[in-house]
Every structure is written in C-alpha cells, then in structure tokens.
Amino acid sequence: ISNSTLQEKRDAFRYVIGASSLIVFTTGIIVYNFLNIEINSKAKIGDFKDMKKLMKSRSVILIGLIILTAYMGYKTTDIYSLYASEIMLFDEIEAARIAAYQQYLRPLACISIAFFADKSGNINVIIGGFAIMLVGAILFASGIVVAGLNSLFILSLIIVATGTYILRGLYFSILKDGKIPTTLSGTAIGIVSIIGYTPDIFATPLYGYLLDTYEGIKGHQLVYIILSISSLIGIY
C-alpha cells in the first residue's frame, strides 16, 4: 500500500465504493422481493395522532437518549487511527491497520451479546455495555495511554470498541421493554432514530474542533471526557 501511486489508490477507493454500493443495492432487491409482509388494508398507516402520542412517550425519549449516548461511542471509532498516529506514533499503515482490526470486534461482540442478553435481559446488558465503554473512555481521558505503551493502547481500544458494539447490537431491542405497541414500532424506530443519530450532525465537527484547537493528547483527552459523560448519562 505504501508503494502505491496516487492513481492506484484512487482506483482502489473507487472499487471499494462500487462494491459497497452493489452490495447495498443487491440487498435492497432481495429484501423487496423475498420479505413478505402482510398489510392490513384497514389499518391506518402514518397516523399523525400516533406520531404525536409517541413523541410524548417517556419510553421513546429515553430509548432515543440511550441510542444517542451509545452512538457517541461509535463516532469515536473515526479517530482511532488518528490517536494511533498522533499519540502512539504509529506510521500511516500501522494506524490504518489498527482501525481496521477493531472492526472485527463488531460481529463477534454483537453476535455473542445477543445470546447473553436472552438470559440476562437487554437493559442489564446495555448498562454493562455503557460501563465497559466508560472504563475505556476513562483510560484514554486520563492521558496515561501514550507512545511506548502499545499494549495499554490496544487494551483500552478493545474495551471502548467492545462496549460500543455491545450497545450497537442491542439498543433497538429495548423497544419491547419500553412497552411500545408492535403496530407502532416502525414509527417509534423513526422517532428514536431522529434523536439517537443526531451525533452524525454534531459529533464529527465537535471532535474535529477539539482535536484542531488542542494539539496533541489534550484534544483526544477532551474527546474521551465527552465519551465518559455520555456513558454516565447512558447508565443513568
């Protein structure tokens, strides 16, 4: 990779985008053609009264906040490679490899925790996920994860990533714990998604501002302080 020309890197990036788009498009066709859903013609779809009712529901608001605070952890995955290169002094290839490897935790954590949640309950496991994410965030926020302590860096990254993916694998499953009627689950998911995915709007600019304004480890510490606060809110 390090010996690739700019044109070769562009071509590789183009192939990645093309392959991803093809997979998404193919998945859409498969779902459309093979997922049979029975629709009751008498049922009202998109009833505004139901939407207003759900927007006033304490359960919907709380689930939205759980997703929001959990998603703050997911947004930190964008800066793992930056931490590796700026603070741990890894080269560009090593930093990218670290960011790629942590992605393998996602299917492992999500699948494993699904079985565990069946026995322990979704809410209890989600609280545990926030607690795990909090521990990792505190390690990074403390400033002790610095160049030369590669094992501590890997351990801290695994802790944060594991907590993040535990939450990501379960947060929509708590809709039933919120006693939301199945007939309104689609509308409820839409509302909690609007609340929960707002970090897509503000988290990246916020993290970017902190990292640009406060050079070195200071900026990263501030990012993980925010993540620690988000984890505490999620636990609460």
Predicted regions and their residues:
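A late C-terminal transmembrane helix in Major Facilitator Superfamily
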Residues: 179-215
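C-terminal transmembrane helical hairpin of 12-TM major facilitator-type secondary transporters
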Residues: 121-174
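Transmembrane alpha-helical segments of major facilitator superfamily
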Residues: 98-106, 192, 196, 230
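C-terminal membrane-cytosol helix-exit motif in multi-pass small-molecule transporters
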Residues: 21-41
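A membrane-interface helix-boundary motif in multi-pass transporters
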Residues: 2-21, 208-231
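Extracytoplasmic gate region of multi-pass secondary transporters
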Residues: 59-110, 203-204
